[in-house]
Amino acid sequence: MEAERQNQLVARLEDYAEREQALRRYLDYDAKSERLQVVNAELEDPAIWNDPKHAQDLGREKKSLEDVVETLTELGSGLADSCELVELALADSDDATLEAIEHDVDRFQEKLETLEFRRMFANPADPLNCFVDIQAGAGGTEAQDWASMLLRQYLKYAERKGFKAEILEESEGDVAGLKSATIKIEGEYAFGYLRTETGVHRLVRKSPFDSSGGRHTSFASVFVYPEVDESFEVEVNPADLRIDTYRASGAGGQHINKTDSAVRITHAPSGIVVQCQNDRSQHRNRAEAMQMLKSKLYELEMRNRMTEQQKLEDSKTDVGWGHQIRSYVLDQSRIKDLRTNVEISNTQKVLDGDLDPFIQASLKQGV
């Protein structure tokens, strides 16, 4: 192995070792290691299953802790071993070992970058599950079909990330597609990953609904908000609520329309309306709708605070919550994020849920 390549290998190992130590401090490795031991001990106690919800919460916490603790432990051990091996290999001019270490260092780089990416999740709500609201804009059938395409895109994205996705509500279009839909996405940092998807998404294509093959432009809005838990205080006055029940519509089997199981809650002070129809039980739909309402109220408060902050900081971007964020020009094979200028030519791959290039760029640029 040539000298320059050897020097680069040594420099990379030194750099990664420093970054690994910095991550241990930033991610509080010692405290997480201790907490993981406590959680494991609790989960080993058979009595934990007397409270299934607590057991499930601990299971999720365990996975979150392991993602950090085990990765850093393996990374630290691997880097230490490689540093020792590279000294011996250099002394013996053992090129085969040096090349093997190079492959290991590539893996270390990937793990480091994954952990460092987590540092971008500074919002207290980033680790939470989230809801995604999709609303067709003006444009009739074309816009409603676009809304259904976006719904599929986010369901595919959730599948790619290993998240659980559930359609809570969908209002069918007049001819095709959807007027609106709400999905719940559960997974670690689901809100952190998806929050920058909030905004207006523009589609340009030759419409399949136009017999002349004309080029059409349509819009749909996406709004992402976190599922708040008990650690977030959200006060809701029952006197401010109007609760309506109705028969669910859309797919759901032969029993779905026989009872008024769907629930719609209107919060008078804010004008927020939420609805849920995914369960046959009115009680469960009502509980889910209340959770959605609290989450929307929390996000509304966060948005109001951000708006006030932006008024004080002239250097902030002028991209607002309702502004266009991404343009999907299918007949030119081009999808472009208007905030980060990231552009992808493989449009089908994006529509199949590969949103990582857009999301990562948005988070890195602090959109």
Curated annotation (Swiss-Prot):
SUPFAM superfamilies: Release factor. The keyword Chloroplast does not apply. Signal peptide: none annotated. It is found in: Cytoplasm. The modification N5-methylglutamine is found at Q254. InterPro entries: PCRF, Pep_chain_release_fac_I, Pep_chain_release_fac_I_sf, PrfB. It comes from the Bacteria. The keyword Cytoplasm applies. Keywords: Cytoplasm, Methylation, Protein biosynthesis. PROSITE patterns: RF_PROK_I. Methylated by PrmC. Methylation increases the termination efficiency of RF2. GO terms for cellular component: cytoplasm. GO terms for biological process: viral translational frameshifting. GO terms for molecular function: translation release factor activity, codon specific. Peptide chain release factor 2 directs the termination of translation in response to the peptide chain termination codons UGA and UAA. HAMAP family: Rel_fac_2. Belongs to the prokaryotic/mitochondrial release factor family. The gene for this protein contains a UGA in-frame termination codon after Leu-27; a naturally occurring frameshift enables complete translation of RF-2. This provides a mechanism for the protein to regulate its own production. This is Peptide chain release factor 2. It comes from Bordetella parapertussis (strain 12822 / ATCC BAA-587 / NCTC 13253). The lineage of its organism: Bacteria, Pseudomonadati, Pseudomonadota, Betaproteobacteria, Burkholderiales.
